């Protein structure tokens, strides 16, 4: 092998290694990324069972039903649409009806029930993501300005 051929082989091997590393990183991210949806988004274009997502909105008024132990069922709404959520675990102290919430989990196969792995309660509307706040304002359910007065 000439010097030029060796250099070309090293460059080609390095490029192959970098391409493999990039593909592995992209694959790892695609397996762990959870996209954010609101109930209205899922009403327009449903997500298949088993897909990890984040579901956000407000806890529906009168929707909290406690089961045995730490089981709880409630609905998440954006003012126009609502999705039933089932969670088995300890809820955050700030979790209550009408409060902002973000849940992460998957839809139950053959059902329209969202099974949450984690539940995050929003402390205050001031800390709500802009996309959620904009949607709630558009739907007329925003309580941010009144809550601070």
Swiss-Prot record:
- Molecular function terms, GO-annotated: heme binding; metal ion binding
Q: Where does this polypeptide localize?
A: Cell inner membrane
Q: One cellular component GO annotation, for this chain's record?
A: plasma membrane
Chain segments annotated as transmembrane: 8-28
| Keywords, alphabetical | Cell inner membrane, Cell membrane, Cytochrome c-type biogenesis, Heme, Iron, Membrane, Metal-binding, Signal-anchor, Transmembrane, Transmembrane helix
Q: Which InterPro entries match?
A: CcmE, CcmE-like_sf, NA-bd_OB-fold
Topological domain ranges for the Cytoplasmic compartment = 1-7
Q: How does it sit in the membrane?
A: Single-pass type II membrane protein
- Gene Ontology terms describing biological process: cytochrome complex assembly
Annotated residues that bind heme are located at: 123, 127
List the stretches on the Periplasmic face of the membrane: 29-149
Which protein family is named in the record? Belongs to the CcmE/CycJ family.
NCBIfam families for the chain: PRK13254.1-1 (NF009727), PRK13254.1-5 (NF009731)
Question: What is the recorded function of this protein according to its Swiss-Prot or TrEMBL entry?
Answer: Heme chaperone required for the biogenesis of c-type cytochromes. Transiently binds heme delivered by CcmC and transfers the heme to apo-cytochromes in a process facilitated by CcmF and CcmH.
Protein name (database record) = Cytochrome c-type biogenesis protein CcmE
> Origin organism of this chain?
Rhizobium rhizogenes (strain K84 / ATCC BAA-868)
């Amino acid at each position: 092998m000439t010097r030029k051929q060796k250099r070309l082989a090293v460059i080609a091997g390095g490029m192959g290694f970098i391409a493999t590393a990039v593909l592995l990183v992209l694959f790892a991210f695609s397996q762990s990324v959870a996209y954010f949806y609101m109930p209205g988004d899922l009403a327009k274009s449903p997500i298949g069972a088993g897909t990890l997502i984040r579901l956000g909105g407000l806890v529906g008024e009168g929707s909290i039903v406690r089961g045995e132990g730490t089981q709880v069922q409630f609905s998440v709404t954006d003012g126009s649409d609502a999705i039933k959520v089932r969670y088995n675990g300890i809820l955050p102290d700030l979790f209550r009806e009408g409060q902002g919430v973000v849940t992460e989990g998957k839809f139950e196969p053959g059902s329209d029930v969202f099974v949450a792995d984690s539940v995050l309660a929003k402390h205050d509307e001031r800390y709500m993501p802009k996309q959620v706040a904009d949607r709630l304002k558009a739907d007329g359910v925003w309580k941010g300005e009144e809550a601070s007065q």
